[in-house]
Amino acid sequence: MANVVENLGKLERRVTISLPKDAVQKEVDSRIRQLAKNVRMPGFRPGKVPLKMVTQQYAGQVEAEVLSDKVGKQFFDISRAENLRVAGQPSFAPKADAVEGDYAFDATFEVYPEVKLGDVATAEIERTKTTISDAEIDRTLDILRKQRVHYHARGEAGEHGDGGADTAAKDGDRVTVDFVGKIDGEAFQGGTADDFAFVLGEGRMLPEFEKAALGLKVGESKEFDLAFPEDYHGKEVAGKTAQFAITMKKIEWPHLPEIDAEFAKSLGIEDGDLTKMRNEIRDNLEREAKRRTQAVVKNQVMDALLKISELDVPKALIEQDQQRLVEMARQDLVQRGVPNAKDAPIPAEMFAEQAERRVKLGLVLAELVKANELQAKPEQIRAEVDEFAKSYEDPKEVVRWYYSNQQRLAEMEAYVVESNVVDFVLSKAKVTDKEVSFEELASATAQA
C-alpha cells in the first residue's frame, strides 16, 4: 500500500500510520512473558508470579511502549521510502476512524526547506581594517599606568611629592567621606556610611554627590539635595529627593608609575627594554585587532548571506534552538553564582528572534558549503589548531588536547568551515575597505 503524504503548508506534512492490532498484541504478549521471568510481587518468588497477574499489572504500560516503538519505526521507514527530510520531531495523534482491526495514528511534522541561494556577487561587504599606530600604543600605556595607580595623602610630603599646594579635593583624587542621607527626615537603607572611599571623576557616584565632594578639604562638611533618577536601581528611593550631609575625612592624589625599565619589567619584559615593551604591546594589539576585525567581517558576511537567500524556516527547529539558548542562559547564571539559577524561569520567547536567525543561517551555510565544496579539509583543521597552540607554553600538548576529544575537534572544524565561507564570499562580493582606529573598533565590537 502506497504511503500518502499530505501537504498541510509550506513545510508541514502529515502521514497516516496503521498497525494491525494482532501484530501489536503478539509483541505485547511476548514482552510480558519476558517481563514475567523477573517481575517481583508480594507473596511470590521472583519469576513465579502468575502470567495473568503480570498481564493485569503491566499490560497497559507494555502496550504503550510497543505502540511507541512500532509507530516510530514505521514513521522512519515511511520517511526513508518517501525521501522526506524531517526537521525536528514529529507529533503523533491517534485517529478515531481507524480501520477495524488496526491502530491508526496521524504523524504531523515539518520538512527541511528548499534553500534558494542568491548571487553572492551582489552582496556588499564593508571590510574593516585597523593599523596600530604609536598613538594607540601610548593610549594603551596610559591605561596600563592607570591600572597600577597608587595614592598619597594630598598636602603631605613624600617620595613622589605632595600633590601640589592645593589641598582641596579635585577630579582624580581618591576621597574618603562620612555621609548621612535622609528623605523627609527619615534615614533610608544605603543612605548612611562611614569611611566611604571613591575616586572623583570616575562616575561611580551620582553627579550631585561628586559635585558636593569636589573642592572640600579634610574636616570640611557640606549639605546638599540629591534627586535620585526615576530608573535608579534602589526602587525605594527612585524618583525621590534626599537631603545629604557629607564630611571629608581623607584626600589622596593619584601617582601614576613612570614608563621606565621597572614598569617594563612589571609587564613581563625581563630586561626592562622599553622598545621591546612597545613592540610587545603592538603585537598584542595587532592580534586583538585581527580577532575583532574578523568577527566584524564575519557578521557582515552572515548578514549578507541571509539578505540574498530565500527560505522558510521550520518552527520545530526554531523551538529546539530556543530551548538550547534557554539552557545556555541558565548555565551562565549558574556559573555566575546567581541564587536559584537552576530553577529560575527563563521564557523561551525571549530567544525567538535569535533562534530563528541561528537556524536560518545554519540552513543557508549548509547549502552554500555543499554547493561550493567549502568543507573543512584535515590540513586546514590542523593548521588552525597549530596556530591556536602557538600562544601556549607547550604547543604540542595543546595539539594533543584538541585531537584527544572529538567535540573540541568538531568545534575547530566548524570554525574552519565558517572561515572558508567568509573567504569565499569576500572573493565574490563587492568589498570596500574601511580604515578605523583600534579604539573605534573596540567600541563597535563591545556593543555588538
Curated annotation (Swiss-Prot):
Protein's UniProt keywords contain Isomerase: yes
Record's protein name: Trigger factor
Gene: tig
GO CC field: cytoplasm
EC number: 5.2.1.8
GO MF annotation terms: peptidyl-prolyl cis-trans isomerase activity; protein folding chaperone; ribosome binding
Keywords noted in UniProt: Cell cycle, Cell division, Chaperone, Cytoplasm, Isomerase, Rotamase
Primary site of residence: cytoplasm
Similarity remark: Belongs to the FKBP-type PPIase family. Tig subfamily.
Keyword Cell division tagged: yes
Span of domain PPIase FKBP-type: 172-257
Xref: PROSITE patterns: FKBP_PPIASE
Free-text note on domains in this protein's UniProt record: Consists of 3 domains; the N-terminus binds the ribosome, the middle domain has PPIase activity, while the C-terminus has intrinsic chaperone activity on its own.
Lineage of the organism: Bacteria, Pseudomonadati, Pseudomonadota, Betaproteobacteria, Burkholderiales
Enzymatic class: isomerase
Stated role: Involved in protein export. Acts as a chaperone by maintaining the newly synthesized protein in an open conformation. Functions as a peptidyl-prolyl cis-trans isomerase.
Catalytic function, reaction form: [protein]-peptidylproline (omega=180) = [protein]-peptidylproline (omega=0)
SUPFAM superfamilies assigned: FKBP-like (SSF54534), Triger factor/SurA peptide-binding domain-like (SSF109998), Trigger factor ribosome-binding domain (SSF102735)
Localization terms from the record: Cytoplasm
GO BP term (any one): protein transport
Family matches, as InterPro entries: PPIase_dom_sf, PPIase_FKBP_dom, Trig_fac, Trigger_fac_C, Trigger_fac_C_sf, Trigger_fac_ribosome-bd_bac, Trigger_fac_ribosome-bd_sf, Trigger_fact/SurA_dom_sf
